[in-house]
Regions:
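Amphipathic alpha-helical interface elements
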Residues: 1-162
Length: 162
């Protein structure tokens, strides 16, 4: 998979419909879950096919291998949201979907997301400076961005400590 910059990832998610955004976001999140597993278990790729772990199992393995447990809930909800779209092609993203994902974040991650968005909104003179007042698509995009960033950081920390 091509490594996208943060801006490219944001743009990729922004140009998709609900289905495309959720599926594409999930693919990129799972990519970083796999990268974390490979860094934590250098032989993981050799046995990954035999292990045949689904996304949920991979996220649990990540937590067992040192990924902050604060990400367990949000990562699980990303998988459930992806499954809703995969198994119900006409499914539409709801406010509740996004609210539940946001609520699954730790208080620290919620505050980080709000502060980061506010700073960006001021910097780029966005009309809406409050995360909570954004639409579902915009909030989900930022939630994907946050989770991807947390996984990338955890992956980098594993590599630094190796």
């Amino acid at each position: 998979m091509n490594e996208l910059s943060d801006d490219e990832f944001h743009d990729t998610l922004s140009c998709e419909d609900h289905l495309g955004m959720v599926i594409r976001g999930h693919i990129h999140i799972e990519h970083w879950v796999d990268r974390f597993l490979l860094s934590a278990m250098p032989c993981y790729d050799k046995y990954a096919e035999d292990i045949n772990a689904d996304y949920e199992t991979k996220t649990l393995l990540c937590c067992a291998l040192g990924l902050t447990p604060e990400l367990k809930g949000p990562l699980a909800l990303i998988g459930k949201l992806r499954n809703r779209f995969a198994h119900r092609p006409s499914y539409k993203l709801t406010k509740s979907d996004v609210d539940n994902l946001y609520a699954a974040l730790s208080g620290t991650h919620q505050q980080h997301l709000k502060k980061s968005y506010k700073a960006l909104a001021l910097r780029y003179q966005r009309e809406e400076a409050s995360f909570s007042k954004l639409g579902n698509i915009e909030r989900l995009n930022l939630l994907f961005m946050l989770l991807r960033a947390k996984l990338k950081k955890a992956h980098a920390q594993l590599n630094e400590n190796a």
